[in-house]
Amino acid sequence: VDEKQNRDRVKQDTIVKDFENWAQNKNIKFDGLRHEQFEFLGSKIQGIKALGKVDAGKQLVQLPKKFTISTYVSEKCPFPGWISNSFWDKQPNYIRLALKLLWEKKLGENSAVQAYVDLLPDPENLDTLYYWTDEELDLLRYPVLKNSVLRQRKEWDELHKQLVSSSPGGAEGAPAPEELAWALGCVLSRAFAGARTGLQ
């Protein structure tokens, strides 16, 4: 294990500990779960481990709504000085969530969910197929999958162009292409849909 890997592991351990302390202080309940490093294909990946048997229907996590990043179809744009209302109104929920995630990242220490945002992987540590080179995709020998990735890249590039052209601050105010791709990747691998009833 080289020095950089050791530094990265110490940094990740600190981020996880800070997140867990923040969650407990905010009355976020996750009894019976803990963060864990798992061996996967010769490397370690971060995940969640259940500390015992999980019965069907058991509630695993409970948190106040103010500590979620969420949206709904009729929601008005929460940051019209940054993203135009016309752009926001046309977007599906997963794109809205990505924009909200970027906004929280932009807020930094002023974000109510900074500890969660810090827990997300850095752009250079995302390893989804979106980030593979064309040569690496060719190694899969699965043209349908490669074409799907290329289509996603094209769609996200087009989305970014639309975002910039409709942004009140233009290119300088809008997220960079790599920032948007990072947020979309995080949302698509973590978000879920649920009923809004009973949220507080």
Regions found by a protein language model. Name each.
Residues 1-67, 72-75, 105-200:
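Long, positively charged leader/targeting segments at protein N-termini
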Residues 85-91, 95-103:
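E2/UBC-UEV (E2-variant) core
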Residues 71-88:
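Short, compositionally biased
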